[in-house]
Amino acid sequence: MAKIHTIHANGSLPRPTLWHKMHNYFTLVKNEINPSLSADVPKVEVLEQELAWLKEHLSQLESPVVFCHNDLLCKNIIYDSTKGHVRFIDYEYAGYNYQAFDIGNHFNEFAGVNEVDYCLYPARETQLQWLHYYLQAQRGVAVTPREVERLYVQVNKFALASHFFWALWALIQNQYSTIDFDFLRYAVIRFNQYFKVKRQVSALEMPK
């Protein structure tokens, strides 16, 4: 992932895709799907407030905009044990986005998709170790505990946006997709986890 995040665009750096895509998803949910929403899904007015809060809160974190996979769940990671190589597949959602979103989204995916279990979300110490290796691989030099802690805070805050993004996406899929999957249930799970961890994650402070 660190190597992918070092891919640069020619010329000026593109704007992150996160807010544009989430706004489009929300608009679709509001205008075309709202009447059919389940009682377990937050009201559209609540979703609109949360989207505004996310943009205001996360935009202040100064997470770098890098080339991201944006959908790095386990099935999109191929490991060649004979060569010790890892490669990623399925770049359908790839694009320039916040570094912390890509990592936070990857951590969220530890919980799985078909049988979601957020007990599998990596613990703080596991994350710190992962982020330490990530920064070292990206920079090629030693990193400080403060740098690791800073990325940890950014990642866990952007993990909130990951929940919100895929919950909106799932509502749309529930309306239009022909895939045999309970997208509505998945949307409810992601929204529930968002609200469950929001207060705790919001309280995280950047290191001085």
Could you tell me what each predicted segment is?
Residues K75-G112:
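Catalytic activation segment of kinase domains across protein kinase-like and atypical kinase folds
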Residues A100-A142, L160-T178, Q193:
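Active-site activation/catalytic loop segments of kinase-like enzymes and analogous catalytic loops
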Residues Q173, S177-K208:
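Regulatory N- and C-terminal appendages and interdomain linkers associated
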